A protein has these predicted regions:
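N-terminal leader segment of winged-helix/HTH proteins
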Residues: 1-30, 78, 99
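N-terminal positioning helix adjacent to the helix-turn-helix/winged-helix DNA-binding module
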Residues: 4, 15, 22, 35-36, ...
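Membrane-interacting alpha-helical segments
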Residues: 2-6, 58, 62-63, 91-93
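Residue-level recognition of specific faces of alpha-helices
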Residues: 11, 39-42, 107
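Charged, amphipathic alpha-helical coiled-coil/dimerization segments
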Residues: 71-113
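N-terminal helix-turn-helix DNA-binding core of bacterial DNA-binding proteins
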Residues: 21-65
Length: 113
């Protein structure tokens, strides 16, 4: 017989998958990868100047994934990178990136809060 704890974990996993699918569809509708969406979302949440390391920790995304997405977003003129102390890289919106994020990602952020 399945324990209450196992049933609860299965239910949690199912809900997590459903939520993840919703965010995936939102990102696709904006022609963004999931990681690019999370980076822009994080910049809106934490503000200009957050580090790539902050994003990795906050969303449990690998450094390589964040770095690849940041490079792609930078190539598209959405954000810029600036060196920080040591090896830290800080991210800042371009004017286009801020407008895009506030228009498209801002409503998602507002809906959650």
């Amino acid at each position: 017989m399945e324990s209450k704890q196992n049933r609860a974990l299965k239910e949690f996993d199912s809900l997590y998958k459903m939520i993840d699918d919703v965010y995936h569809e939102i990102a696709l509708s904006m022609h963004l990868t999931d990681s690019a969406f999370l980076i822009l979302y994080c910049l809106l949440e934490l503000g200009d100047g957050c580090s790539q390391k902050d994003i990795c920790k906050l969303y449990s995304i690998s450094k390589q994934t964040v770095n690849s997405s940041v490079k792609s977003l930078e190539d598209k003129g959405v954000l810029i990178r600036k060196a920080g102390v040591g090896r830290d890289i800080h991210l800042f919106f371009t004017e286009f990136g801020r407008e895009f994020s506030e228009k498209h990602i801002g409503p998602v952020f507002d809906m959650e809060n």
